């Protein structure tokens, strides 16, 4: 498509924004990245996402696509002729991919957040839930290199952004993902070898420092 305008409104530590960065990189779509200050949201963000007022927002030729998973599907549908395919071609496999992306959003984010926003028994419960969630995902991965099989795709894109937060999760939750879920870590390292992922995810220590600042603001330090 010629003369296209693609803009991404994002915030660097957002695992949801990372999904769009990866998907756009996989499809080799050129876009303008606009970093948002979430304490002082831009008029463009408020105009493009008036309902939730959240990032990320993909803007394609002036039209906004909100919610990261929906936007990844949009990228696949609009640029379906550009390799690679991010979603499976088989309807059942596509439904399964959407199921696991939904599971990730409904479970992993909240459990991960509680690891650094809570203490004591509540934090211990969150750690247990978080590790159990990873083990469920390990089961879905099985012995495949990626969740969709031999090819990096939709579920991998939905999940890998969380990996940039794992140093923070482990630091405040006091556990080792590699000890608990070695297959998950092996998958994450495999994904990190892809240029689209490596260039889209911030360094784990940088995210840890960001979380430390948030904890101070929340009065947890």
Swiss-Prot record:
Residues 4-83 form the GST N-terminal domain. This is Probable glutathione S-transferase. Root tip-specific expression. Its EC number is 2.5.1.18. SUPFAM superfamilies: GST C-terminal domain-like (SSF47616), Thioredoxin-like (SSF52833). The keyword Transferase applies. One of its GO terms (biological process) is glutathione metabolic process. One of its GO terms (cellular component) is cytoplasm. Gene3D superfamilies: 1.20.1050.10, Glutaredoxin (3.40.30.10). The keyword Transferase applies.
